[in-house]
Amino acid sequence: MKLLIIGKAGSGKSTLSNYLVKKYNFKQFALGDNVKYFISDMTNILHNIDTNINEIKIEELFDVETKKKYRKHMQQIGTDLCQKWFGKTVWCEITNKQIKTNSTNSNIIIDDCRFIHEYEYFKKQNYISIKILNNRCLLMNHSSELEQDLIEPDYIIENNNSIEDFYNIIDYLMTKLLKHNLN
């Protein structure tokens, strides 16, 4: 099963992804990870080329105020610069190649879809799309946060209550998806 997660900053995308990795044996990928590696290479933040993608998250190197600036830089470099230079689907293509090269797991989750072209790219590859709605999301004006409002996913789940409630909603959806996947 291949899942594509859509949601604004703070909606619960990583929470959902981490839960599916632990409970349902999914392998997680993120389009934004490659933006982080690109920035890392360009700025020499990390010097150890043997660092595993899952061992360190570059944004953890920054304090809260710097993280806000870092997010803005990621958006500017990943969207405003690289997509213009290399094409809109550059991060989709790189992530897709990583999935094909590095994963034998048939349960794949991409947990950071933000644009219509990303959605369309992975829908063509039979990904099931899930949008997370959360009333407490941070309001941001970058296209990566606004354009996703136009995406009509296969499923919508809400994350407005406790973490336990969110897990119950995820379990309910997974039961439905697994049952449908078997038929």
Predicted regions and their residues:
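ATP-dependent small-molecule kinase phosphotransfer cores
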Residues: D33-N105
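Small-molecule kinase domains that catalyze NTP-dependent phosphoryl transfer to phosphate-bearing small molecules
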Residues: I6-A9, I94, I116-N183
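Conserved lysine of the Walker
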Residues: K13
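Hydrophobic positions on the alpha1 helix immediately C-terminal to the Walker A/P-loop
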Residues: L16
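Active-site signature of alpha/beta-hydrolase-fold catalytic machinery across serine-
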Residues: Y19
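Extreme N-terminal starter segment of soluble prokaryotic enzymes
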Residues: M1-L3
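Post-Walker A helix-loop "phosphate-sensing" segment adjacent to the P-loop in P-loop NTPases
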Residues: K22-F29
